[in-house]
Amino acid sequence: MFDYSQYEKAPLIETKDYRAPKNGNVFFYNTLDKKKIRVGVWYPIGFKENSSSRGTIFLQQGHNEFIEKYFEVIQEFLNRKFIVICFDWRGQGMSDRMIDNENKAYIKSFNMHDNDLNEILSNIIEPYLSKPLIGIGHSM
C-alpha cells in the first residue's frame, strides 16, 4: 500500500452541505522540477489491499477545474468498489502555479502536464493501486 506519511498533507475545501468522500488521503506530491501537485486517493469503505477493489479510476479534471468539483463523482465510484485517484493539474486548484498570479492557470508547454501525469502514473498508481486502471478525463 502507498505510504502517505512521506508527503505533506493537503487540504480539501468543504461546506456544510458539500463534503469530501470518506476514506481518502490528500497530499502534495513533489515533482522532479520541485513543484507541488495536490493529489487525492480514496478507497472504498472496507477496502483491504489486493482483495476488495474492482480496480482504480484515474479521474483527470478539465481545464481550470479542481478536486472538490468531483466529490460526487468520486463517491459514485467508491460506492461501486473502485479506488479513485485524482489530482489538480499544475497551475490549477491547490497545485503550484508557474507564475506569481494565483488567479491564472499558465503553463509554458502542455508537456508539463504530460510530465506530471507520467510521474503520478509511475510513482503512485502503477506500483501501489489496484488494477485494472481506468482513465476518465474531462475537457483537457
Protein language model annotation of sequence segments:
Residues M1-N30, I37-I45, E49:
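An N-terminal hydrophobic leader/cap segment in hydrolases
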Residues L59, I85, I136:
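Conserved Rossmann-like nucleotide-binding pocket used by diverse enzymes
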Residues Y128-S139:
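Alpha/beta-hydrolase fold nucleophile elbow
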Residues R54-G55, K81-F82, S130-P132:
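Short coil/turn segments at beta-strand junctions that form active-site/ligand-binding loops
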Residues K35, F66:
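Donor nucleotide-sugar binding loop of glycosyltransferases
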Residues I67, E72-I99:
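Conserved alpha/beta-hydrolase
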Residues A105-P127:
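Alpha/beta-hydrolase active-site loop
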Residues R54-E65, M140:
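Active-site glycine-rich loops that stabilize anionic/oxyanionic intermediates
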